[in-house]
């Protein structure tokens, strides 16, 4: 099928590349001329495992191309996906101006029937607004259908998630649009759930909020474990073995971040408030998430006493491993607070350095080129992102290079007993701290 994706960020680029890889002909559109120039030159502006290879393969086979021209995309495609940003507003709502702008641009060039698909994460009832905008600004009286098709991609696993989805959600009113969407997803051989548009829009917010709830739940439990001497990892294993609960997203740490969870939860709270049904549970999820960062920083403060002029290494800047995305990263927040208190921060991340350097709030940090360089002569190490590279570090080298062997593990990446044996003072989340033998 002929498909266009308007918006070539994380969601749009991965979606377009994977659609092309299963045989569709795809045009990815973006209004960022530099990004389109990069993509045409074979340079991939984001890091996502497996994505670069897929893009190069499908550009070579002429199933995937890039343009800044929406008119070209609309005229060439049966189905048009909207995958533009929906950034958060100060009140927790989301800015839908990019979605509205694209809807108007589509309307301006739409002359024949097309299916317009909301792929961006949007508040319930957005599909109705998109349809109204296209109808209002289309001068040709062209027929069209609007569909909600939320994405469930995890950065770092996005290619796998798209190629092997748990489910496909299609929210639509038209049987013709549903049939076309089923053809798009036929190669993926995944269960398809067909709903009304509002339900599809709500499913995305409900899913992300529930996952964030699991994270905040285990983080709240971690505080109880620290107070009682229990081990949060064993507690999580015990409850996660129940198939009704599952072990995923029960990893205690310094809280969730990224471009989705914080924004989507705030948006869901705003949506529920606007509907007159306040979602108090989600406010508590937010509170626990903030409290977890505060507790972690308090441990650092109480252990090191005065942070001013202390050399502190920070491993990890991205909001999670296997991505270069530093948006709303808890790791960045930790670095920012350490700098604010006068620490000399030396930071390292396997993939996020370029984007982290551009963040003004942490401009005073020193950026190392390797993990070992970061910890050389450090008075403490903070692990803020759970990259495999950090889990597999040579602890003897780590101990030798550090000035004082103090580690604050915000992701429970290392084994407490092993850290004790190697002579570290080790502090993690929801587990007893250890001291050298």
Show the residue positions of the predicted features.
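Structural/interface elements that position substrates and couple domains in central-metabolism enzymes
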Residues: 1-437
